[in-house]
Amino acid sequence: RSLCIDMINKANSGHPGMVLDGAPALYTLFTKVMNINPSLSSWQNRDRFVLASGHASSLLYALLHLSGYDLSLDDLKQFRQWQSKTPGHPEITITDGVDASSGPLGQGVPTATGMAIAEKFLAEKYNKEDCSIVDHYTYVLCGDGDMQEGVTYEASSLAGHLSLGKLIVIYDANEVTLDGPLSYSFSENVKKRYEAMNWQVIEVADGNDIQAINRALKRAKKELFKPSIIIMKTVIGYGSCNQGTNKVHGAPLGEEDGKNAKLSYGFDHDPFYVPEEVYADFKKNVKDRGTRAYKKWLKTVEEYAEKYPEEYKEYKNAIEGNYHLDITE
């Protein structure tokens, strides 16, 4: 949270609202749930993460930096600057560790649905009963604005129909839009709608409760025949004097409010300061854990290649794009 406040303040541009209320969820996801390898961000069997609400990019960048991706503290200081590695919305061709570019609200869930379809297709085509080389999840963080977009529901309907159990959406329900309270423009019962689309719906009453978020994510992972949506109640701009209002949605906190927000978190340090114990925590719980998962997967791949050489050759060519396809032939 503190890094994000500093990034947005220095740029004098950005969206702190969702960043501050969604930080506990993504901290939990990165450090306790996702299997990723910052040393090899292109690892084929890594879990995927899609930031549907791309305006909350500072939160993703802070997590990528802390996790050990090729994103320095100086890069964070260049947030939203021309030709920086930390643009206003994430771009897969610019920033190490970004799995999906973000654009207009609504596109994140469809993008993730496509990823989950690809995972399921590859798993069913190549996995064997004694050897699974494709086995990863796709996670999404979305907000109220995404739920107001029709394409989100179209993709969600397809995901439920296809039983994409490895698609997990975290819905940051802070009930505030840039224009004001969500009630001005939206009153749907999202829970009932997703239940009707064959999704598992899990509710978290407090978006600051890391233990509850962790339990919800683990429960979601166990349901392999339905996609899951975790409806998480949050307070937009948590810690700001304007928390809970649209004033904190898309404007920097400023020096005074930013400092007071940090104090409310129990963090009283200079801008962009990161304690060494924080880096150590992320190294242990993200990088080291991900490296172990990667090495375990490599052993599985070696076993698979030995037992099923033809299937492995086909899989490898498909993944690496080594096929020549000509529809005229």
Predicted regions and their residues:
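Thiamine diphosphate
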Residues: 1-138, 280, 284-329
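Glycine-rich ThDP/TPP pyrophosphate-binding loop and its adjacent helix/strand module
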Residues: 38-39, 94, 100-285
